[in-house]
């Protein structure tokens, strides 16, 4: 054989040997797998074989039925979550209702099932044992665990409530006269729903905790406006929560009621816990201000209103008595007002929804409140509340003081951000009454803001006129002021220059401060309006010209793209009223600079004055259209007043009058005399210092 043949035979041998080893490896690797599978199948088969109820379990169930079951003739019956037990004489019977309306008798669970029924019996066995555990956990309340949820409605002209039998609570609250921008579209304003709101009362004994959120109540329609969610123990023993919704009201009466509960609850129980959790839903198109103006508010009994941070995660714990607690939105609130008070509180919490999460577009915050209430098992009404579910309207909230608490100011109007003390006083005593009066005329709210602006301008007219008169005098004196500045230049002549200025003002009867003071006195009104309009629910959803909602930005230009710097400054839109306000503000600044030439002589003042309107554009771009519209109208009226004053106040007449005043001997005013004396003392000190240096 040649070398090629030998090489071919060797290669064939290698291939055959390789395949043999490969097949041998597969057989060996498969063997453990097969053994594991067989063992797993055996284990599964063992697990799938249901054991039976033993004598101890049956005896325990029999004792439970006798202790917690309901009397039915000569039998005791106990039902829990589709499991029914019956004790008659000394025998125990029962059944388990399975899916598909299949029933398994309790007697069938007392011996091992056949292989065909083991899955069904396993499920039935689990239900029986869970029922026994529920009884151990809930004792007399076990009959109210499980079962299907039922919903009943309470409704009036303003509010629709869905009451859930699960927990006996308000599952959903819908405001009928308001719409909300939720899940990308407009619809009825739902304050909360069952998935994102829950509350309940809990009674703690030495051995058990009974939480109403875990029980299924029976709805009892007492009349058109009242529903009692009831846990009926039989024999005249019951516990319930009664809800009453009066006509044309946002105020829900919620009362905890009971009868003969001493048969179930020990008399040494003196407190009842209350827990309320809510994931606050978005309602507005303008996300920025909705986030800034939502959170947890609360009032101490006989004391002030406080709140958790509205812009960051926060929590607080107090041992003081609380009168009410509110989960407050920008324009709506859920307020629970206790007839008596809450006894302190576990940490109240507010957590801002992460901006990077999917929930951020639909929700604002996760909030919670935990507290306690006084409880007496023999009191037929151990706790009662007024539950406000409605708009943050000043007139409405202020009316509850007389309706609910005539002896104590509830201060619910503090839910509306109207500014600090002085600005709040201007809003509550002047702005809001006039605004409400104009609102009775059924005018468009854009017109109402215009009329309110005109009224404010009329009230401030004397101050504005005084300011412009002073500016006219300063314009007339501008050449003389320039002459003094040129004659006494430099810091070394500062005192002399200032003295000559004061002499000039005194001769002419002018005061450089008289123009500033009227403007300063007008400032609180502008700040008050800055607080009032963004919180005014009357503007919500009201259209005017191109603005579809005066409480939200009137976005004339929007974009989704991420534009560096631009997005950081403006967000993703530009508001037209804000742009108009900025343009008018620049015009007003120009006119004001022309009217006060002295400002142009100050380094950097000119550019500073023109920069301010641009800063306002950035600042107000996210605000509601109503506020920008107000400032736009106010500036237009101010410009009109400026031209009117220039027509009325002739500078020639002002100059002639000042010349006439200069001829008269004038007594120095107290301010001018003190200022001149101070200047002379400073000059003397300066001369003394110069002598010492020499």
Where are these regions (language model features)?
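Helix-loop-helix
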Residues: 1-43, 48, 163, 256-257, ...
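Soluble non-transmembrane domains of integral membrane proteins
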Residues: 51-411
């Amino acid at each position: 054989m040649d070398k090629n043949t030998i090489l071919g035979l060797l290669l064939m041998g290698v291939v055959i040997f390789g395949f043999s080893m490969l097949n041998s490896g597969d057989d060996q690797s498969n063997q453990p797998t097969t053994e594991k599978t067989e063992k797993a199948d055996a284990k599964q088969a063992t697990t799938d074989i249901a054991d039976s109820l033993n004598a101890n379990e049956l005896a325990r169930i029999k004792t439970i039925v006798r202790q917690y079951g309901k009397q039915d003739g000569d039998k005791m019956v106990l039902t829990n979550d589709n499991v029914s037990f019956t004790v008659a004489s000394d025998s125990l019977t029962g059944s388990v209702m399975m899916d598909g309306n299949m029933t398994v008798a309790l007697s069938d669970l007392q011996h091992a099932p056949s292989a065909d029924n083991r899955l069904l019996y396993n499920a039935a066995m689990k239900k029986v044992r869970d029922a026994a555990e529920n009884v151990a956990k809930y004792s007399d309340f076990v009959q109210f665990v499980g079962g299907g949820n039922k919903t009943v409605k309470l409704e009036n002209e303003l509010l629709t409530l869905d009451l859930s039998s699960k927990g006996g609570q308000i599952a959903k609250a819908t405001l009928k006269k308001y719409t909300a921008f939720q899940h990308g579209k407009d619809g009825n304003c739902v304050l909360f729903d069952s998935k994102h709101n829950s509350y309940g009362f809990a009674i703690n004994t030495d051995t058990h905790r009974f939480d109403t959120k875990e029980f299924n109540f029976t709805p009892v329609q007492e009349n058109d406006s009242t529903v009692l969610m009831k846990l009926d123990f039989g024999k005249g023993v019951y516990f319930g929560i009664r809800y009453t919704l009066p006509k044309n009201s946002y105020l829900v009466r919620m009362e905890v009621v009971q009868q003969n509960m001493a048969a179930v609850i020990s008399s040494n129980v003196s407190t009842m816990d209350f827990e309320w959790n809510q994931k606050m839903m978005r309602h507005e198109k303008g996300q920025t201000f909705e986030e800034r103006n939502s959170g947890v508010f609360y009032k101490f009994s006989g004391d002030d209103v406080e709140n958790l941070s509205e812009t960051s995660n926060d929590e607080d714990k107090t041992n003081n008595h609380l009168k009410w607690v509110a989960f407050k939105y920008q324009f709506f609130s859920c307020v629970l007002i206790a007839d008596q008070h809450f006894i302190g509180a576990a940490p109240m919490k507010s957590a801002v929804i992460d901006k990077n999460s999917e929930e951020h577009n639909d929700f604002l915050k996760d909030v919670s409140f935990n507290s306690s209430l006084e409880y007496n098992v023999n009191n037929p009404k151990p706790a009662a509340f007024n539950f406000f579910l409605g708009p943050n309207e000043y007139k409405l909230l202020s009316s509850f003081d007389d309706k609910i608490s005539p002896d104590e100011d509830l201060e619910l109007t503090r839910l509306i951000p109207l500014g600090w003390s002085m600005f709040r006083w201007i809003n509550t005593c002047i702005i809001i009454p006039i605004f409400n009066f104009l609102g009775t005329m059924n005018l468009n709210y854009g017109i109402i803001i215009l009329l309110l602006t005109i009224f404010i301008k009329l009230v401030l007219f004397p101050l504005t006129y005084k300011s412009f008169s002073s500016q006219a005098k300063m314009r007339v004196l501008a050449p003389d002021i320039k002459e003094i500045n040129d004659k006494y230049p430099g810091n070394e002549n500062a005192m002399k220059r200032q003295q000559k200025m004061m002499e000039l003002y005194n001769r002419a009867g002018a005061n450089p401060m008289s123009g500033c003071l009227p403007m300063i006195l007008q400032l609180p009104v502008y700040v008050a309006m800055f607080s009032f309009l963004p919180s005014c629910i009357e503007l919500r959803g009201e259209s005017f010209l191109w603005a579809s909602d005066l409480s939200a930005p009137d976005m004339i230009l929007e974009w989704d793209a991420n534009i560096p710097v631009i997005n950081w400054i403006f967000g993703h839109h530009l508001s037209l009223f804000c742009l108009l306000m900025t343009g008018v503000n620049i015009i007003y600044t120009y006119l004001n600079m022309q009217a006060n030439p002295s400002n142009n002589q100050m380094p950097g003042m000119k550019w500073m004055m023109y920069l301010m309107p641009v800063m306002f554009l950035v600042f107000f771009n996210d605000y509601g259209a109503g506020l920008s519209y107000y400032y736009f109208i106010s500036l237009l009226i101010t410009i009109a007043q400026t031209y009117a004053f220039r027509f009325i106040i002739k500078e020639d007449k002002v100059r002639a009058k000042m010349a006439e005043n200069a001829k008269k001997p004038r007594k120095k005013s107290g301010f001018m005399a003190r200022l001149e004396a101070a200047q002379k003392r400073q000059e003397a000190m300066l001369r003394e210092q110069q002598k010492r240096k020499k």
